[in-house]
Structures are given as structure tokens and as C-alpha cells.
Amino acid sequence: MSWYSVDSEIESLERRHAGHHHTVNIKYGYVILALSIVHMVLSISGKKLYFKNWAETGRASSWWRSVVSIPFWVSTLVWLAIFAFLSIFHIEELSENYTTAVKRLGRMAYCLVPFTIFISLRPPNTVGYQSGYYLEKLNLHKWISRLIFATAIGHGLGFLYKWTKEGALAEKIFKFDNFLGVTVFALMPVLIFASVNVMRRRNYRLFYILHNVTLWMFVVLIAFHARPGVPLLAVINLALLGYQIYQRFFKSYYLHDISVVESPYSKMQIIRIPRPETFPSYLPGSHIRLGYSATNISAWLYATHPFTIASTNDDSESTLDLVMNKPVNFPIDITSPYTMTGPFPSLPPQFYTTARHVNIICGGSGISFGLPIYKYFVNSNRSIPIRLIWCIRSSDDTFILDHLLPERSIDVQIYITSNTGSLNQQQSASTIFDEEADALLEGDSTTNIEMANLATDKEEKKTDHFNTIHDGRPNFDDAFGNLAAAVDVDEKWLIACGPRKLIDDCRKWTKGKDIEFYSELYEM
């Protein structure tokens, strides 16, 4: 072998490995894994300390809340900065050694997958609520997933550029281990496009199927594609996905004998589920998730659907009552079996033991969230001021209270925002939260419960249920006047559940009034 050929071979190796051993990128993957573990530990520990401080002091600390409620976009930007820094760290002459950075991007993306799966887990009836509300992590899960996919796409584009430059594109693409990566790479732009709000809401089922197929292919195929291998990460990812399947199908309750209560002129209906004997105690405002039986192919293709439990945890309650609208995209067939997971709490236990003045406003099917909280405080021995306001489009919907609030001594303020009562003018409103909660949701859109540009209180009358009924929208200064006037009371709360317009207006009203605010979004 000539000295020229030896020098050429050495130069070739230097170009491939940038002067480092080919395993140099392994440590950067473990750095990402370690940082994600730190993120999880700090998040859970912060929640525990926040709730501990709340229980000990009797009030929710605004400082602790700011610590544990870091906006998802801040966390996403931090992770983006970490990826940007590590991807080029300690790489000299990047233009020549860009393949080292490209390889590193792929490894870092795969090593962040356990984190995004972990924050999407839904542990039911979390003891003491100590880990917080799983839906609080929803936006972070969504954007971290997008960061992973964008990074993986960058990895794929880098190698496509390299192979094209070398004139070996066709040869390299169809090499087995490369082809596994190319297959996943081809799915990712499609999923990102399908995840855009407009597309996702137009066909959530398609998005959900694409999401799961891409995730499983990413976890499994990249385990065989990666060089050097990622056996530990693959085991962690598969274990977390296996836990999700276990919770959904093997820790769920199988339901039969579901009944429906409805009124011919209302678009709302009550679904009554016999309470399973082993169903645990739950806090007011908790929700369950309904799905199809495991023997139904739909159970494996489509998401479960979240519904707030409109009934209370009282021992006399033999059913779990849900409020939903008809028709819905998850129609209930009383002759078919279903599965149920949960309960999942929303507000922490400390709220129920420390709140001293509470007002609740609900829009449409949001009554399923506000009503059990209202009943809890009315029936408790604490005797705190409590008020419930319900905004609906039709007086026909008040039949809900005849079944869920039989106590005739309890007064609920009802605002009817439309005089028509026409069934055709009411839109579907059945479940809770955003559809990103892994459910195909339909909700009270801002055109359903008109909260703006309507005349205020025009007429007042009594029903035989002792509920005060108003025509028009509520004037917040009047409706919540008792809350604002209680200047010497700590732990004043306004709870809003309904469409985004209602929630945004309520949040603005609380500004500068020393009033705690909590909301649940019921929207498609």
C-alpha cells in the first residue's frame, strides 16, 4: 500500500468521524436523558412542595404557583436551546464535519422520547393529587413532540443531502437499516401537517391514528436503525408505551347497563353509568374517560373520550352521571359494552379545605364540572358563601337540574342567552377540555353560548325548581359582586367552565381583584 493511499484513508476516516471515536455521540444522548429526568423530578417535587405549603398555610402561594406553573413555551424554548447547543458542541469545522452534528440530532431526538411519553401518562386517582393534573402537561407534550420530530427531520435531511452529494442516494436509501429510518422520516412531515389545529380539529381520528402509528414506528424501527444501538432507550420507551396499554385495557372498568335520560326539546342528555363496586372515592370536578370494549377494533384505533362526572362522591350516589349533547361524535349505544378509566381529579384537595368564598360560572355542558363542586360546598359543614351561575341557550336544557339537583332549597342563577330555544340553533357540546386531551371532542363553541354582544339582564322569573332565571348574559360586576365585595377574605375563588370566550372574560374580570381563578375549557 502506498503512502498516498494510507494518507487518503486516514483523511477519509477523519471526515467520517470528525477526529473522534465513532461512539462520541452516545454521551450526548445520555445527557438529554439525564436532563429530562431532572425536568420530571423537579416538576413533581415542585408540585408536592406547592401542595404541602398550601395545606400548611391554608392558602395557595402565588410564589409557589409561579414556580410550578412555568409556561409550556418557556420549557419548550429551553429544550430548543439545549438541542441547538449540544448539536454543535465540540465540533470543529462544522461545514466539513456536519455529519457528526446530523448523527447527534438523531440520537438526541430518540433520547427525549421517554420524556414526552412520561408527561402524557394518565395515572388515575393520583393519591393526594401530588403529581398534579395530567392535562396541565398537555401543551408541553405537544411541543416537545414537535421538537423531537423536527430534530429527527433535520437528521434525515442531513443524510439525504450527504448521500445526494456523494451520488449514492438510491443505494443508501434502500440499505436495510437506512430504509428503516427513511420510513419513519417520511411519516413525520405528514404527522406535523395533520397536527396543525385546523387539520387536527377537522379530522381528529385521522390525526390520532397517524400519531400512534408514527410513535410506535419511531420507537421500534429507530431501535434497529440507530448506530451505535440504543437498547436501553428502546426498553424504556416500550415499557412506557406498555404501561399506557395496561392502564387503558387492563386497569379499566367494563361497563354494562348504561342508561340515558333526555328531554325531547333539549339537546342535552344525561348518561347514567352504574358505579362499579371497586370505583374509588373521587373529588368533585373529576372526570373519567370512556372508550370502546377491547374486543371492538375502534378501541385500538381511536382515543378515549373524557367526560366530567356530574354526580358527587356521596355514598347514596349509585351512578356516575355524565352530561353530554346529542348528537355527539361518541354516541352511546346502551346495548354495547364500554370501558372506563379514572377518576382523574382536576382541582387539588387543598382547594376544598381552604377555599372561603367561591363563585362558579358554567357555559352549557360545563354544568357537569361546576355542579358537583357547588353541591360539595353547599352540603359541607363549612358554610362558606357559594354561588353557581349557568349560561345556556335554551330553557329546555334546565331539565338537567331536575335530575342532578333535586334539592329544592338550593338556588342556581340561570342565564338564557337565546330566546328561541330552537334545537337547530344549539351546537354539540358534550365533553371537556381541548381535543389535544387525546379525545375526539365536541364542545360549546363561542357561537353556542353567546357571551358577548348580548343585552344584559332583561327579565327575571322563578321556576318550580327555585332557580332564578334571567334573559341575556350576566353582568359580571353584578353576578360576582359578592365575591369582589369580600375584601377581608382570603382564598376567594372564581371558577369558570365553558367556551373560551367565557373563560377569557372571567379571567380578565379577576385581574387586580385578589381573586384566585381556575378554568376548564369546554371547546372543540
UniProtKB/Swiss-Prot annotation:
Natural source organism: Scheffersomyces stipitis (strain ATCC 58785 / CBS 6054 / NBRC 10063 / NRRL Y-11545) (Yeast)
Keyword Glycosyltransferase: no
Entry keywords, A to Z: Electron transport, FAD, Flavoprotein, Ion transport, Membrane, NADP, Oxidoreductase, Transmembrane, Transmembrane helix, Transport
ATP-binding found in the keyword field: no
Domain Ferric oxidoreductase: 105-222
InterPro entries tied to this protein: FAD-bd_8, Fe3_Rdtase_TM_dom, Fe_red_NAD-bd_6, FNR_nucleotide-bd, RBOH/FRE
Molecular-function annotations in GO: ferric-chelate reductase activity
Subcellular location: Membrane
Residues annotated as transmembrane: 24-44, 69-89, 104-121, 143-163, 179-199, 206-226, 230-250
Protein name: Probable metalloreductase AIM14
